[in-house]
Regions:
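C-terminal and inter-domain tail/linker signature
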Residues: 1-106
């Protein structure tokens, strides 16, 4: 997540694209959609979305896996089964957050 955050904070979409699968997707639950997060498909679109929205997030463990915590109450859950990130789920709906274990490293 350090590389994702560094690239997002600097607005380096090329660096973000290098971390993403070419067919990566970004999905938004209803709570995130109400906050203006829109779905994206393809590394360039997902990179732009992350650069625009994840720059102020901080690293977190979401259900034990690397993710991001964004204020006020949203999480980014990444799927990278064997290499590049294939999907990003942005969750902000309280019903989707209530059953998640979120830990912010010190």
């Amino acid at each position: 997540m350090d590389a994702v955050l560094a690239a997002a904070r600097s607005g380096d979409t090329a660096a973000l694209r290098s971390l993403l699968d070419p067919d990566a997707v970004l999905r938004a639950d209803p709570g995130a959609a109400r906050r203006g997060v829109r779905p994206a498909h393809g590394a360039p679109a997902v990179a732009r979305a992350l650069a625009a929205r994840a720059a102020t997030a901080r690293p977190a463990l979401v259900d034990g896996a690397p993710g991001l915590l964004a204020a006020p109450s949203a999480i980014y859950v990444f799927t990278a089964p064997a290499g590049p990130i294939t999907s990003v789920d942005v969750l902000a709906d309280p019903s989707h957050l209530s059953h998640r274990t979120i830990a912010v490293p010190a």
